[in-house]
Amino acid sequence: MPLPDFDVETGLIKKGYKAIAGVDEVGRGCIAGPVTAAAVILNPQKIPSGLNDSKKVSFKNREKIFQSIQDTCTFCVAHSSVEEIDQINILQASLLSMKRAILGLNIKPDFVLIDGNKSPEGLESKSETIIKGDSKSLSIAAASIVAKVTRDRFMSRLDKEFPGYDWSQNAGYPTKLHKSA
């Protein structure tokens, strides 16, 4: 399977866009914890190496790449709580966390690349959805790593508060142990 690249972003840069944000979320299939989204604006001169869909990167490498993103990129992370998920449903909560991440960037993006087939409503920037975008766009891949590392760290802290669910290992995703309980 090919690695994500910077082709979509390069095309947008050639059209005059300067600040291009990639957006992705994690936690939609979980039975515990928030849905977490990240928006990342890569510096085209300092793209971190190893970027890929967070599901295809080992824990150790995700941590290294996350540090590199922190050092070289503009990003924002946002969550939708369990209560919000219950009130508005997981899809709407995912879109809400994406919108919060985009609006929370300290640089307003000219263009937003969004993983999936739905875009949050009310964005001030132009946007495009890309199905499996975390496997196609480096900006979205970076967002997937930031969202995953941030949410996994949150679930590890939650594991200390509520031992016995193994949240630090399964990050809130259902396991055979949960299904047999």
Task: Label every PLM stretch briefly.
Residues M1-A181:
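RNase H-like, Mg2+-dependent phosphodiesterase core
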